[in-house]
Design a protein with these regions (language model features):
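Small-residue-enriched transmembrane helix starts and helix-helix packing motifs
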Residues: 1-21, 114-154, 177-179, 183
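Juxtamembrane transmembrane-helix termini in multi-pass membrane transport proteins
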Residues: 2-74, 164-183
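Alpha-helical transmembrane segments and their helix-helix packing motifs
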Residues: 8-11, 66, 77-78, 132, ...
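Hydrophobic/aromatic residues within the transmembrane alpha-helices of Major Facilitator Superfamily
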Residues: 13, 17-21, 50-51, 85, ...
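Membrane helix-loop-helix hairpins that form the core translocation module of multi-pass transporters
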Residues: 39-122, 195, 211-214
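C-terminal functional regions that serve as terminal interaction/effector modules
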Residues: 213-223
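Juxtamembrane boundary at the C-terminal end of a transmembrane helix
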Residues: 222-230
């Protein structure tokens, strides 16, 4: 394993862990795991995060081939400084950890009630048809797995962790970024699913945000001081 892969892996792992712990998708995974089978929630959430990491790394890898590498390097540097200041601002803001956890829980409760209301409108014939198809469909497309996947995927889309992964892949070895990102996502998601709401409620989102902001600023400074070939 080359030094560039190790550097990309280390940066991606640290960034992912500090970005995802206490994130909305972290809380969502913890709450879903309390209401549904953990293995399905873990598979759905982790599957979405792996797909998102790979897609983000591909975009970052392709960027230097479409835009001069010097420009992508400068853009990445600005992103790191911007995300660092943004994350620090979030960490020092007045919003409490319980507020975000309650917000995610309320959103999931609302979605569950909507789904239940739609289900009661189905006819008996539809129920019989669903029962006949259930063994095959459930083995491939579990509703719980799909729910966990969609909530996580769309929750992460456009998030600063996704944009930071794109920036890292543009500036570092993309293979290392993917490996570090996937390992970080696996660690955070597994902790959320196994720890449940009790773990999520005991995490100091403020301290995690401050640590993440400092890390982004360190990455930005390192990128600013480094040189890149045109």
């Amino acid at each position: 394993m080359t030094s560039s892969v190790i550097q990309g892996f280390t940066k991606s792992l640290a960034m992912t862990v500090l970005s995802e712990i206490g994130d909305k998708t972290f809380f969502a995974a913890a709450i879903l795991a309390m209401r549904h089978p953990r293995r399905l929630v873990l598979a759905g959430c982790l599957g979405a995060l792996i797909v998102m990491t790979i897609l983000s790394a591909l975009v970052g890898w392709a960027a230097p081939n479409l835009i001069p590498r010097v420009w992508t390097h400068h853009i990445t540097t600005i992103l790191f400084f911007g995300f660092g200041l943004w994350t620090l601002w979030e960490g020092f803001s007045d919003k409490g950890d319980e507020d975000e956890l309650a917000e995610v829980e309320a959103k999931l409760d609302s979605d569950m009630k909507t789904t239940a209301a739609k289900a009661t409108k189905g006819s008996k014939g539809d129920d019989d048809l669903k029962k006949q198809k259930r063994p095959f469909l459930t083995s491939l497309f579990s509703p719980i797995l799909l729910k966990a996947f969609s909530i996580t995927f769309f929750g992460e889309w456009g998030d600063k962790s996704q944009l930071a992964t794109i920036g890292l892949a543009a500036d570092e070895n993309p293979y290392g970024v993917v490996l570090g990102g996937i390992l970080g996502q696996a660690l955070c998601t597994t902790a959320a699913v196994l720890g449940g709401k009790s773990l999520a409620s005991n995490i100091s989102e403020k301290m995690v945000a401050i640590s993440g902001g400092i890390l982004f600023l360190i990455f930005g400074m390192q990128s600013f001081l480094s040189t890149v070939e045109p």
